Amino acid sequence: MTISIDKSVKKAEPSIFDLCDDWLKRDRFVFIGWSGLLLLPCAYFALGGFFTGNTFVTSWYTHGLASSYLEGCNVLTAAVSTPSNAMGHSLLLLWGPEAQGDFTRWCQLGGLWTFTALHGAFGLIGFMLRQFEIARAVKIRPYNAIAFSGPIAVFVSVFLIYPLGQQSWFFAPSFGVAAIFRFILFFQGFHNWTLNPFHMMGVAGVLGAALLCAIHGATVENTLFEDGDAANTFRAFNPTQSEETYSMVTANRFWSQIFGVAFANKRWLHFFMLFVPVTGLWMSAIGVVGLALNLRAYDFVSQEIRAAEDPEFETFYTKNLLLNEGIRAWMAAQDQPHENLVFPEEVLPRGNAL
């Protein structure tokens, strides 16, 4: 007796999710992925808002300033400025009660700033998710995405959390080079930011990372190629040699002779290079969150009291406090004209009086 077995297995119809997943993760020149659904439109709108504001939109109604190429600014002085203080923390939606669907009025009120800031934040988050997604696809660990959390933390703390802790979006940085410089001066004058321990950790992390990057790049470059006999150093390294001669042992021996210590293995070396800048950025972001709550930096009150009592006693610290007072006196009246702040002539710093 012959028994026939039907081996055909009926496959389930792919769901809409499966079809979308297949299309999004298809191998193409520019990977899209699920993260691309967040990244690509947000990055497009953020960059579009930035370039539109820089090119066409004035800050006359929000800061009393010219801030566009159309008004005569250049690439360093143009900016997408924050909304006026009167707008508070409104999202300034185009269809909201402030602009009421009027695009021109929306631009005048500073709507492009909230548009750019929010789309920029979600665009950065989308880029981090993109790194997670591709790392999973090619089966590597997601340390790139974890490292990118540092820039995201700084952006969100400076552009979103800090102004949320203050009166309004007005106190956030505008999107422009000179505008960021003004914001840095504001941070110093009103928060004594350079004496904040979190700022110190941030500087140590960023500059330390630059030093580590330079040392690491030079060391690897030094050991990639075999040294030759030519008198000229650059002729001695032959980039056309058949094999690289990179050696962790050689590099370890070099730095052991230089410093007396060296990294024992590649994993610890590269984790340290990851840890230093990311921790620095996170510490800086935490410090900015503290400033949003108006937490103070270091105060050396004993020096302040002695400087007030003894005209011959002055330190760099007390001198910096005087400079901060000057920044506040000049900047508050000019930067917040709506407050109608008036300072008597005798309290304003003049020339080299500081």
Swiss-Prot record:
Membrane topology per the entry is: Multi-pass membrane protein
In this chain, pheophytin a is annotated as bound at 131, 144
Molecular function terms from GO: chlorophyll binding; electron transporter, transferring electrons within the cyclic electron transport pathway of photosynthesis activity; iron ion binding; oxygen evolving activity
- Single GO BP term: photosynthetic electron transport in photosystem II
InterPro entries in the record: D1/D2, Photo_II_D1/D2_sf, Photo_RC_L/M, Photo_RC_L/M_CS, PSII_PsbD/D2
Write out the residues that bind Fe cation.
216, 270
Q: Which residues cross the membrane?
A: 42-62, 126-142, 154-167, 209-229, 280-296
Give the family per the record. Answer: Belongs to the reaction center PufL/M/PsbA/D family.
* HAMAP family, sorted: PSII_PsbD_D2
Extra remark beyond the main annotation = 2 of the reaction center chlorophylls (ChlD1 and ChlD2) are entirely coordinated by water.
The protein's role, per its UniProt record:
Photosystem II (PSII) is a light-driven water:plastoquinone oxidoreductase that uses light energy to abstract electrons from H(2)O, generating O(2) and a proton gradient subsequently used for ATP formation. It consists of a core antenna complex that captures photons, and an electron transfer chain that converts photonic excitation into a charge separation. The D1/D2 (PsbA/PsbD) reaction center heterodimer binds P680, the primary electron donor of PSII as well as several subsequent electron acceptors. D2 is needed for assembly of a stable PSII complex.
What protein does this entry describe? Photosystem II D2 protein
- Give the species this sequence originates from: Mesostigma viride
